[in-house]
């Protein structure tokens, strides 16, 4: 399985390192997943900088960060601690804590995710960004931003802060992917491999359905269903504990140039899943929330240089129980067989925080491998 390709598209010089030294035994990282320690000396923003920041999407209800930004740390926290999109509860990308440069000692160095902002005109003549894996501990992600001035850092962070955040997110996803390699559902993997695909679905997921959905009636665990033709679908579920996690992978012929647009993917999701996933009330089915928090999409990079369309949204049960939760899907083109492949995860956990569980399930989607990935 090829390693997830991580891109940090920034204009500054980027150096990637692994470990502070060679042959060292690293301690285990401290802190929880999706926590980030920010090491920096704070300073107030100028009024011009405050006015510039106020014009951006960093501070509004959509970003989830609405408190005033008056200093450098506020600016960093506005990005790293912004709300994740399309979540039923308010949950940030990262839980952010801060220490000053003087406070950053050996007690803090093993922290799992560290962002160091070093502003020093005596040491630096230009801004540089360096990223490291397993520098003081393992697993650890470390990003250093070195700059001669506060003004240069503010301009840089406004333009590239979200890319830095994405790098940290990708580090967490990569760690989770490595964990899945040690324990996969052999039945689910064999089903996908028979279609020319591969995916690391964990062994604690159970195969619910594997079928070709066509004009004829097919069987689900609950109801006979009839769906549009030429859709091959695998549905797996982990219903252990207080949270339910589901994975669906479905493919269909590539026939429409609009396939990778949000309206098309929304319609295809509704057409397939509404006929497959039902609830206990007769006539109920899986739907998508379009009014309160519509789905959002973006292009992402998976495998090495392959592209996928990511969709995030909220699912809900229609004509039945008051059930719903977040979902994430990746859609790619199988270039060898001319088929579209969508892998989606969705969660149900009433009243519980879901960010970490969703990210863990999302990491499964990144392991999807299509025929062209093995040819490279």
Tell what function each PLM region has.
Residues 1-4:
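Positively charged n-region of N-terminal signal peptides that target proteins for export
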Residues 14-17:
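C-terminal motif of bacterial Sec signal peptides marking the signal peptidase cleavage site
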Residues 19-25:
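Bacterial lipoprotein signal-peptidase II cleavage site
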Residues 27-160, 165:
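Long, folded non-catalytic interaction modules
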Residues 37-39, 53-67, 204-280:
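Secretory pathway targeting signatures of secreted, lumenal, and periplasmic proteins
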Residues 90-145, 151-152, 273-337:
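Signature of long, low-cysteine stretches enriched in small and polar/charged residues
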Residues 140-149, 245-252, 338-348:
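Short, well-ordered beta-strand elements
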Residues 152-178, 339-376:
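Surface-exposed amphipathic alpha-helical segments
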